[in-house]
Amino acid sequence: MAKIIGIDLGTTNSCVAVMEGGKPRVIENAEGTRTTPSIVAYQDDGEILAGAPAKRQAVTNPKNTLYAVKRLIGRRFEEKEVQKDIGLMPYTITKADNGDAWVEVRGQKMAPPPNSAEVLRKMKKTAEDYLGEEVTEAVITVPAYFNDSQRQATKDAGRIAGLEVKRIINEPTAAALAFGLDKQEGDRKIAVYDLGGGTFDISIIEIAEIDGEHQFEVLSTNGDTFLGGEDFDNRLIDFLADEFKKEKRLDLRNDLLAKQRLKEAAEKAKIELSSAQQTEVNLPYITADATGPKHLVVKITRTKFESLVEDLIERSIKPCEVALKDAGVKPSDIQDVILVGGQTRMPKVQEKVKEFFGKEPRKDVNPDEAVAVGAAIQGGVLQGDVKDVLLLDVTPLSLGIETLGGVMTKLIKKNTTIPTKASQVFSTAEDNQNAVTIQVLQGEREMAAGNKSLGQFNLSDIPPAPRGMPQIEVTFDIDANAILHVSAKDKATGKENKITIKANSGLSEEEIKRMEEDAAAYADEDRKLRELVDARNSADGMVHSVKKSLSEHGDKLEAGEKEKIEAAIKDVEDAIKGDDKEAIEAKTNALMEASQKLGEKVYAEQQAQQGGAEEAQPQGEKTVDADVVDAEFEEVKDDKK
């Protein structure tokens, strides 16, 4: 039975894990690392790189190297957070026809899900290489504070990558699973503080033993889907650019290559400042003007960096306060605080968390891997490999519809355990109204306009009646993936209409299907490209070997034989320049046949040299050899006695 893998699709890095022998295992990628950069590069020749290879070429291809795209998934172009990112990213963020935030690659608009699909495809391949079998099913994690359209867009990305997404689970919940699965410490409430590359979540979770079963119940969740390590990097980038501008009067923000180098340097400096009190950013030849090349050399202390990001760390505390209030607990009720996400390695973040909760955060959970491990455990639960685990997650935001006067009427309150279902009866606002529009909303504001619109649908053919008389029953149904299905039914006629909220990724079902097919086609294309490269390498090796033999032993061949081999070499070299695998293999075989005579000459010469060496060997040496052999034989005989 094929395994269900667990994938942490992160903003900055991604990770994949699988259950083996009842234990979760994080899988190393082709580069030998346990996490993979969530970076995708689109090259001139059409090749798509994902992970470390994409990151390595980012400096020379900044406009077509996409990172932190998860921050755009399911978002509108006009949102202030998206507008802020436009000025920071070296690639182009553009407005889709439906008003969503898309990206532009090589002059073409692209929705975020296909880009995320490339990262998922890389994780899928990593798992397949390790397991030695095809992987088609996965549990994928998302930030707990992702709204419905962001969850749908993540599911779409999985489909495009050739994965059936068995479950979408929240990152803090996954981390709690990773932490609590083997703990036998009795009932306890834990806080999962998850500050990743692009998003922040806080979840209050109760772990309980009920009839021998590990129950993980999410009491509340809160967060900020536009707060993460990328924002910390951007503060450092701005600081470095400002320092350079003060000294050299040149703004590096206008130079895409320089901006990309600053991004790499800022990330490196941030990591170093978690263990060192000071670091130096040294970027020679960062730019040039009429007076010549310019170099950037800036020293940064940990204290300076902390002052640059103080407000960002503070921003994470408000959601913690709200989450505790919603769960009905005090900081002193929390037994353990778990840190998740690479940014939690920053000492100042740990200090702030300790100050708020009044206790040291746990250090026995790997912040980069815990989420993928939890996803793999959930995969094991779904597959039946992990028993006695019950996961009770919640919906992060309230759900409702727009009613008379532009008010949002909530049907499902935030932090309701899922799956769940709720119904409410509404009526018409006008006499003889024959249709109603159901506007589905998500958020906490009282007025509809202040909340996120997830979609709308109509219920028509309502029989004429005075206002307030018809009874329209609206039902909200949230599945285990926290994805919403809405229906409206006229109780008098039984007429019903329903909608599954689709992702705000601007991708229709047809487009997603086409992308799935493209992915399968690309897999075949990749295989063919690999075979072509192997054929070229084999041919190149053959040419090198024959040329070497020809230079050493060519004088022993007849002129005609030598010319024939040289002509065959030229044929292979010409074939290598093309893309015809069969032609390369045919020419390589022809060269092999043509050089057969040469091979025979080389072999004969080697035999002759070997024979001559044996004859020339002094008699004394032969005697020594004989003695050695006899001695070995005698030793064996002695052992047997």
UniProtKB/Swiss-Prot annotation:
PROSITE patterns: HSP70_1, HSP70_2, HSP70_3. InterPro entries: ATPase_NBD, Chaperone_DnaK, Heat_shock_70_CS, HSP70_C_sf, HSP70_peptide-bd_sf, Hsp_70_fam. The keyword rRNA processing does not apply. One of its GO terms (molecular function) is ATP-dependent protein folding chaperone. The modification Phosphothreonine is found at residue 199. It comes from the Bacteria. Keywords: ATP-binding, Chaperone, Nucleotide-binding, Phosphoprotein, Stress response. Induction: By stress conditions e.g. heat shock. Residues 604-621 have a biased composition (Low complexity). Residues 602-627 are annotated as: Disordered. NCBIfam families: PRK00290.1, PRK05183.1, prok_dnaK. PANTHER family: HEAT SHOCK PROTEIN 70KDA. HAMAP family: DnaK. Acts as a chaperone. Belongs to the heat shock protein 70 family. This is Chaperone protein DnaK.
